[in-house]
Amino acid sequence: MTGRTHMAVGAAVAVAAGLAAARLADPSAASASLASVGDASLSPAAFLSLAAAGAAGGLLPDTDVSTSEASQELGRAWAALVALIALSLALYTAGVTPAGQDPFVALRWLASQLGPNHLAGAMTLVAVCAVGRASGHRGFSHSLVALVATYAALRLALPALAVPLALGYASHLALDLLNKTPLRLLWPLRRGVCLGLLRSAGMADGLVLGLALLALLCSFARGVLGIVLPWPPGLPTWS
């Protein structure tokens, strides 16, 4: 599957899980029919957070190759951070910063918000990505061990977004299982597994992408705007 398909499916899965959790948390909504309840259950900010986290999780496994979209995006983020630090140092050493103003004020504030758990989680996540890169494409980073390790790291680093990120990660593994190229899902076992049903960047890839985007649109209309969507007659409802 292409990177954009992994992002769309990861976002759709994370938003669907968020809607289900919000529905179960509301007794009145949980006891009503899926076809009749149209009240909004997610704020726009929550929807965007879930979608972004799911999309990011959907790209994480492909950080094991330098040509992947995820790896390129991470490289840009690291480059931006290095550029920011370099600019701060340049301003400090050149004396351009006004007297009494700390050129590292933004970085110091960010560091003050980070506790030991956040740092430990971030370091664990970096280690998972490093092992994945060392093991090659569709190796460690495409395994159940990596999924569990990533979730554990995210629980420390970003507890509020750990579940949608992990769901996006899991959706990536599920999609890649449908591909014709094996992945080492049961790492450290060397044998790869695949179902061989789909081809990356083929017609099926475009179909999956379209369905994921449609699911996101429907989730936004129903979960955020509270629009009751037409329900085909004869289909079962959740009650």
Predicted feature residues:
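N-terminal membrane-targeting hydrophobic helices
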Residues: 1-239
